Amino acid sequence: MERPPVQHGAVCGPWDMKDRLGTGGFGNVCLYQNRETGELKAIKSCRLELSVKNKERWCQEIQIMKRLNHPNVVKACDVPPEMDFLVNDVPHLAMEYCAGGDLRKLLNKPENCCGLKESQVLNLISDIGSGIQYLHENRIIHRDLKPENIVLQECNGKTVHKIIDLGYAKDLDQGSLCTSFVGTLQYLAPELFENKPYSVTVDYWSFGTMAFECIAGFRPFLHNMQPFTWHEKIKKKDHKHIYAYEEMSGEIRFSTSLPEPNNLCSIIVDKIETWLQLLLNWDPVQRGGGIDCGRPRCFMLMDQIFSLKIVHILNMTSAKIHSFHLQPEESLHTLQSRIERETGISTCNQELLLEMGVSLDPRKPASQCVIDGVKGWDSYMVYLFDKSKTVYEGPFQSRSLSECLNYIVQDSKVQLPIPQLRKVWAEAVHYVSGLKEDYSRLFQGQRAAMLSLLRFNTNLTKMKNTMVSASQQLDAKLQFFKRSIEIDLERYSDQMAYGISSEKMLRAWKEMEDKAVCFGKAGEIHFLDETIMGLHTEIVELQRSPCARRQGDVMEHLEQRAMELYKQLKPRSPDKAYSDSTEMVKILVQTVQGQDRVLKELFGHLSKLLGCKQKIIDLLPQIEMTVNNIKEADSSLMQMQAKRQREIWHLLKIACTQSSTRSLVTASGETPITSRTSAWSDQSSPQALFSMLTSKDKGREILRHTIDKNTDYQKLLSNLILQTQTTMEQTSLMSMDFSWLNQ
């Protein structure tokens, strides 16, 4: 007997029921929130009276869940005490709540009708593959892997996929392998479908089927048929076949390749096809590729796929994406050579920009193009520009129509069966979304060019400030130098008639004055300053231009209309056998026209950006040369100033020497010496001495002592006069060598 479902808003202690998350074969899963703490828990409760076997299976799921701990397997948690009671003789199961919903919800979105984006596919394969390995290592087979049993959770900005619903899981430690199963048939491995013995490889089949659906938007083998129908048709397929479809004639076709369209780059497609061939092998023994180094080969190949370093480069001159598998330690130059071979743009003309407008560093390896942890060309791109071009002609030819789309465009009123129309319209939605994404990527490339321009403008501003500062300093020094040399020349003229003079020095000073005028020309930066200001104005105008902002609103609106049409078609019953594509074709045509218009504007604006950037590139060497000239002029001016100061100090030394000489001569010259000599002669004549001796009665020794003392003094005075005359002759200004002035 079925238990009535829990009503929305039901209260269980502090826990309020907020939402019903899902209903399974035997249970309901509801979201509860604690009013006091805000904590969220997913509570699974039994809605049916179970048989003894199913009660065991229910309790087994709880036991399995409680012992598992892996980021890609949903965690069991403690049941709140208020809910710790039996329902239909089985307990509740409390689990972590994953707010992103399940994978089926994601796949059902119209934008994913032809598969998920590459980054989403790779992220999902990595997560679910890791979860399956963990279960198998713990000897647990899930047996019911499907999109409904994969939930999504945002964690630190990254989507994490978790496996849920282990109700059908088989614990290998609990007995022999079971041969009966009642899980979802569309994802069921052939041996389970046929009630044959099975192993862990049943999860490989389900995993491969689910991965294929995430890539293509539909299951790999005759997805429109019921399992009982396609099973007989597919069982004889080759082990490398990963895709089967029915043609209009009813003939079944097999393929070893993924169908188009999908969102994978060519490098990933090749690897994924090989990987799917291992998972979708009909033979359960061969499925997974056997064991290599203690691990199934399919997981070894997964590791190889996720270790690939792939750089995706958008050629802005052709709007084409080029993907390159980087070798370990590959240099940037080697990568550029490979780019040249594919694009025809020579390495010297290649400019590779990251999303933020930063140029790649040629000193670093090519792996700088790849961010660790980021996978998929839809999530990270490098933009290629041709430096030899400043005008990008665009727009370019839109992506080509598939055969199906071309068919309905040629005749939009042709009536097609609803199942076939769904596929054609899914391709139409993918095409419209693709045109919008093409524009978005090109706009991102234009934005990278703008950011690069702003970086160049920042360098230009710095160099301009350096130039202006150097020019102002030179001008100030020139003004000082000119004024000081004017004063020096005036003072020199004033004193040369009666003081020191030198024609060589005067000529040298006047030459300095002339050179200073020439140095002033080095500091003339008005033309460059005006040019730079004009570029600044041009850049501001480019930033303010409407083309600097996304112009894809019309395309986004058309994309939404295409998705709405597809959504309206999807639930229609096949009983309404046929319909035309008139409305969808209108959207296709309008989208192509809209893309052509916005691309014309985009490439026109991009050409202006690149032209402005080239002006800066051409201007930078001129500024650098001007700064160097100013610095050289500044240095020469300072050398002249220092030289002139040395001359002035030398003149001062001469003047001081002459002044000292004159003072000495004045103090000990002829007149004083004569007077002193006369006085001495008067006092020292023999008659006076004898008179003094007579009058004062002095002895002969006193007389001799006095005569000797005066004789010494006379010699000293004579020597001093001789030295003064010699010094004056040696320091005569007119006889000096002024050749050092020209050094």
Swiss-Prot record:
EC number: 2.7.11.10
Superkingdom classification of source: Eukaryota
GO molecular function terms listed in the Swiss-Prot or TrEMBL record: ATP binding; IkappaB kinase activity; protein heterodimerization activity; protein homodimerization activity; protein serine/threonine kinase activity
Record: residues binding ATP: L21, G22, T23, G24, G25, F26, G27, N28, V29, K44
Keywords, ordered alphabetically: ATP-binding, Cytoplasm, Kinase, Nucleotide-binding, Nucleus, Phosphoprotein, Serine/threonine-protein kinase, Transferase
Renumbered residue ranges of the record's region NEMO-binding: 736-741
UniProt enzyme class: transferase
Disulphides: none
Keyword Transmembrane helix tagged: no
InterPro entries hit by this protein: IKBKB_SDD, IKBKB_SDD_sf, IKK, Kinase-like_dom_sf, Prot_kinase_dom, Ser/Thr_kinase_AS
Segments of this protein annotated with the region Leucine-zipper: 453-474
Domain Protein kinase residue range list: 15-300
Pfam short name (any one): Pkinase
Inhibition and activation profile: Activated when phosphorylated and inactivated when dephosphorylated.
PANTHER family, per database record: IKB KINASE, INHIBITOR OF NUCLEAR FACTOR KAPPA-B KINASE SUBUNIT ALPHA
Family: Belongs to the protein kinase superfamily. Ser/Thr protein kinase family. I-kappa-B kinase subfamily.
Protein name: Inhibitor of nuclear factor kappa-B kinase subunit alpha
Organism placement in taxonomy: Eukaryota, Metazoa, Chordata, Craniata, Vertebrata
